[in-house]
Amino acid sequence: MTENKTVSSSSTRDDQTNIGLTCQEVKALREKAWSRTNEGNAMSQSLVLYGASKENSEGFHESKMTNTEGVNKGIYFSYPCRRHSCAVVNIPAPCVNKMISHIQDVESKIQEHLKRFETSFEEWSRTSSTKDLKEDWSVTTPVKEVKPGEKRDEKCPELKQEMETLLSEAIRLIKSLETDRADAEEALKQQRSRKNMINMKIDSWSVWKLQELPLAVQKEHEAYLSDVIELQWHLEDKANQLQHFEKQKTELEEANAKIQADIDYMNEHGPLLDSKQNQELQDLKNHYKKKMEVMDLHRKVNEELEEALEACENARLKAQQIKEEIDKDIYQDEKTIEAYKREIYQLNSLFDHYSSSVINVNTNIEEKEEEVTEAIRETKSSKNELHSLSKMLEDLRRVYDQLTWKQKSHENQYLEAVNDFYAAKKTWDIELSDVAKDFSAISLACTKLTEDNKKLEIDINKITVKTNESIRKKSKYESEIKYLTIMKLKNDKHLKNIYKEAYRIGTLFHLTKHKTDEMEDKIAEVRRKFKGREEFLKKLTQGEVAAGMVLQKKLYSIYEVQALERKELIKNRAICAMSLAELQEPLLQLEDEAERIRSLDKEHSVMLNNIIDQKDLIRRKVGKVKKKLRKKGKKTLDALIETESKRSAIFKDLEATKSKTMIFYAKINELNEELKAKEEEKKSFDQTLEILKNKFITMRFKREHAQTVFDHYMQEKKDCEERIFEEDQRFRVLLAVRQKTLQDTQKIIADSLEENLRLAQEYQQLQITFLKEKDNYFNIYDKQLSLDTSIRDKKQLCQLQRRMHTLWQEHFKLVVLFSQMRLANFQTDSQESIQKILAVQEESSNLMQHILGFFQTLTDGTCENDG
């Protein structure tokens, strides 16, 4: 059944696809299908009639052929066989085999029964056996023929029952066969109608093919004519390309033949090349060893350079700290100057107050004449004190100017040192970049050398050139390393000088700071004196205010004047704060105010005669105040000593912390270096892992490839063994001929080897001489390059030194001019102030003479009145 189905499906597909076939081809296909159906029916019939005799099978086959012979003659598609009819009637093919097996069982039992009753029933056995055989194998005989043997069946009931069952099964099988035959006839009718329909379709398709298919083909041909032309052109192009490739193939074959000849020649002369390669490999190994030594030296130099840079950075940070401290001190000095200004303002206010008190005291001048002389003496002493104070102020100003000038000079020196450091740093960076470039060039050369080692069979001369270049570069690097070591020594010396200058600057700073502290102590003592006098004068004024209420109105007016003057002074203070750099104007104002104070003191000397009565009380109070001030001075000295001890302890702590920080920085650098080493080791391990992975993949691929090659070789081995057996016979015949040719060729090869050895020796000698001359030339060239670079660097250094010298000259000229300008301004201001002081002194002397004359007149008048 499977075979018939496949045949039918294949035939239908062929008919559907091959619609445009001719009628003869259709007839041939029909005949093939008919033969296939006949073969399928024969197979099914042979299966159904399994176990039957040859005569019955032949008769059955003839009867079936008579029924289906007319049907199978015109069938195009495969029609159902016996099995197909059984499948339609739901009776499987093994039912017939089952019936045959039952009949065989019955026959065996009958034979056993006959053997038992041979002696007594010979005649009955003959008749029964013949009848049983007829009943078994004649399927179409009626049932009435069994009656003559009823008497014999009564004697064997078992046999009778078995015969009845067998007959009932045979009748049932015959009925099923009849139904199967009717179903098969209906299926035949359906298949015939299907055949007719298919024939009609085939005829209609053939008519369509004859009528419309040529037009459709022509249209398609016209539609795709351009494509066909393009395809033809492409085919021609491909043919031309094929010819071109064939030509290239022939050329490549010729070139391959030449290369093969060269390879054979190189294989013959391989030992010489191997020896040469071994020598070059040894040279390369020595070169790599030297290169590693140079790299170690380079790393050490880099580490030392990093340490020097760190030391420079530390020095720069220290210098910045020193500068910040100096700036803080300057800021504190400015604050002290502002405090002095405030005190001057307070003194001015006191001066105004004293002037008001002098006006009030003028009323009592006539009564107290004797006390005036003592007041004059006190005024003289106060003048002397004022003169000493003014001198002290001038000294302080000079010291402050000197300190500012020194500070500026130190700042300039610091800036110069920083500029020198950055210039040196730039040169070091340039040199480091040059070294890095050279290192990159060395790495590139090494990679090129490795690639050239792989290609030694092709580029032997190039390898020799590159080895010489590497030797030349090595000498260059050695000279550069020497130069770097010299530069390192110079930098170390320069750093030592910088450290010395920094130490000197620190000592100067501490000395100046100590001097400023002493000056501050002196200023504090002067302030205390002024405060004592202020308290004394306040007490006097309070007594005078209590003595006379009349003076209050005048005091209110004076206070209003003071408020106005204070506002004006506040404005002046704002102006002074805006122009702190211009110190000349406040100095002039201070000198004017000092002159005013002196003139007022002279006026006070006239007015202080009334205060002589309270002199004793004041002296006692002054003594008490002096004692208190002495006690306070002792306390302040103790406090100053404690602060100095604390300051020294703080400085010691700072130095200890600095040393600790240096130690920690060193440890941090060591840890960073260890981290870098670990990272480099990690990178190297990663690289080795990747290399091992790649090697593992390649080895696995090679193993698989080797396995496939081994299998292929094992298959070829069998073929080769057969070929070897055949070729051995040929080899024996050809061996004699080849032995003769071998002797001739050996003689030729010996001669050629002698010639090749001679040529190789000559080539080696020439190469040695060439390499020697080349090394000499490169050494001379390297020396010239180093000399040229050194001369160029010296020229550049000379030019830079000249420029620096000219710039320094200009700078110092400008500094001298600036200092001269300041000195000239200061001298002019001092001369003006001296002239003013002299004028004031003359006026004061005149006033004193007038006052003395006035007092003399007063004394003369009183005496006359008394007389």
Swiss-Prot record:
Coiled coil ranges: 153-204, 233-414, 445-470, 662-696
Keyword Phosphoprotein attributed: no
GO cellular component: ciliary basal body
InterPro entries for the chain: CCDC178 (IPR038826)
UniProtKB keywords: Coiled coil
Top-level taxonomic group: Eukaryota
This protein's record includes keyword Hydrolase: no
Descriptive protein name: Coiled-coil domain-containing protein 178
Gene symbol of the encoding locus: CCDC178
